């Protein structure tokens, strides 16, 4: 006869096998196939089109922006064929003209849509711009390899599609190759407008622009950090929000700032040898990127970029001058470093497509020793986490897990948490949603403009 102890040992493997792996374990498994060699191949293919300038040929089958876009769409279609048609491609386009586009020009983005199985209207978007340039922003004929700027971001988009299309997610993932960035962020605006026209609930845009070199023009190297740029006070709706933010706070709690915190926390848990360096400004000093157009439309967005830039390789004619090599050449890229950044992107997309959207919390507590945090029920959420931190703290300090208090069939059911002896004056509060299988959304702060949806002023009383 078996002893109870031996019976317990016999049962233990089965019990352990029945327990589902944690979200972090699942995310590590999902991103494991990200390949530095595959990324190198994609960047090499993009460089092979000679130039990808927005004003270059759209009809030449081997050279120019048109050939590059066609190739990118072909890669999306190839990945879709491997997953039974799980990706649907589209080519949003518009006519543009401006300071760096002297005549009316057709501008096209290429996107692949991986529709969610439960919440197809909840969307996360990864972007990289496929266009390139040399020293003269108007030179559309010279070779402009654009290996790092932004072949690296475009390769990240394609690799994310290759890896994630092998899985299914409750929410939708959009993979987007954008045009016209170097001429005026046209591709970002085109896709943000397209998202609005489709009625998508955009949870996040992860814009990847210059993510493939680990050594700067001054010789400083850093392959263990990625910079994440995020706006502070929310830009969209800023006039209407200004007075409320002055009274209630929100300078450091835009949805994009919380998206940056989300990426920072995720990188720490992935254990891939990469740490997020949060940069608390919208973009590099005096410069811009396509994520800005998503922010202008009211969608949460951040820019990911290398820890140290090499200015000799950006926006430069390909040449050697006084022994210095100029030009955006594939030889200066660090593909193992690029692969780590792509793993972070891929994990973030998978996590946000698996979690419910963030709530839209509100806080009350003026002239009271207690604080009340309220929000409406989020479809798909099993639990919530209330977080708070001192007003001068950069990261959330206190967490309180809360079960959904509503009966099934009451989608508008309010949630309420009372925090006794926590004075609202001294803290910033936020709430995240958790799915039934444990995936947690980014935190939305209970401040004016903290909700992840585009800001809409309240109706007049």
What spans do the regions from the language model cover?
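Alpha-helical metal-binding/catalytic segments enriched in His/Glu/Asp
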Residues: 112, 126-127, 131-132, 136-185, ...
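Extracellular low-complexity, O-glycosylation-prone stalks/linkers
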Residues: 381-402
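Beta-strand-rich modules
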Residues: 417-441
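Active-site-adjacent mobile loop/cap segments within catalytic or ligand-binding domains
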Residues: 47, 211-230, 278-356
């Amino acid at each position: 006869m078996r002893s109870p102890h031996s019976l317990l040992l016999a049962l233990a493997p089965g019990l352990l096998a029945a327990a589902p792996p944690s979200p972090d374990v699942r995310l590590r498994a999902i991103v494991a196939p990200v390949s530095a060699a595959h990324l190198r191949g994609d960047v090499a293919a993009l460089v092979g089109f000679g130039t990808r300038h927005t004003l270059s040929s759209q009809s030449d089958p081997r050279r120019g922006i048109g050939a590059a876009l066609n190739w990118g769409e072909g890669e999306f279609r190839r990945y879709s064929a491997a997953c039974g048609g799980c990706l649907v491609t589209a080519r949003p386009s518009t006519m543009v003209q401006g300071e760096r586009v002297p005549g009316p020009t057709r501008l096209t983005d290429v996107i692949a849509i991986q529709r969610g199985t439960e919440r197809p209207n909840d969307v996360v978007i990864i972007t990289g711009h496929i266009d390139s340039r040399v020293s003269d922003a108007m030179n559309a004929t010279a070779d402009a390899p654009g290996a790092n700027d932004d072949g690296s971001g475009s390769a990240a988009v394609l690799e994310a599609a290759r890896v994630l299309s092998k899985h299914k997610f409750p929410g939708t993932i959009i993979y987007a190759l954008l045009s016209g960035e170097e001429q005026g962020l046209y591709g970002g605006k085109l896709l943000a407008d397209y998202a609005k026209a489709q009625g998508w609930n955009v949870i996040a845009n992860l814009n990847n622009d210059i993510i493939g070199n680990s050594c700067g023009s001054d010789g400083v190297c850093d392959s263990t950090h990625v910079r994440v740029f995020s706006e502070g006070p929310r830009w969209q709706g800023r006039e209407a929000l200004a007075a409320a933010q002055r009274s209630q706070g929100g300078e450091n709690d835009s949805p994009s700032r919380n998206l940056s915190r989300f990426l920072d926390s995720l990188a720490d848990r992935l254990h891939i040898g990469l740490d997020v360096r949060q940069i608390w400004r919208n973009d590099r000093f005096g410069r811009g990127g396509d994520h800005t157009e998503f922010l202008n439309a009211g969608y949460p967005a951040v820019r990911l970029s290398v820890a140290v830039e090499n200015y000799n390789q950006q926006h430069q004619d390909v040449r050697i001058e006084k022994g210095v090599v100029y030009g955006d050449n594939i030889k200066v890229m660090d593909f193992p470093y690029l692969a780590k950044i792509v793993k972070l992107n891929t994990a973030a997309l998978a996590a946000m497509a698996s979690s419910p959207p963030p709530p839209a919390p509100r806080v009350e507590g003026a002239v009271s020793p207690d604080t009340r945090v309220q929000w409406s029920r989020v479809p798909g959420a099993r639990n919530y986490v209330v977080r708070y931190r001192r007003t001068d703290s950069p990261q959330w300090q206190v967490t309180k897990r809360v079960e959904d208090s509503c009966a099934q069939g009451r989608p508008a059911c309010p949630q309420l948490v009372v925090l006794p002896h926590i004075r609202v004056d001294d803290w910033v509060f936020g709430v995240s949603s958790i799915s039934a299988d444990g995936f947690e959304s980014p935190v939305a702060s209970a401040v004016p403009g903290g909700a992840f949806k585009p800001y809409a002023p309240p109706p007049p009383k």
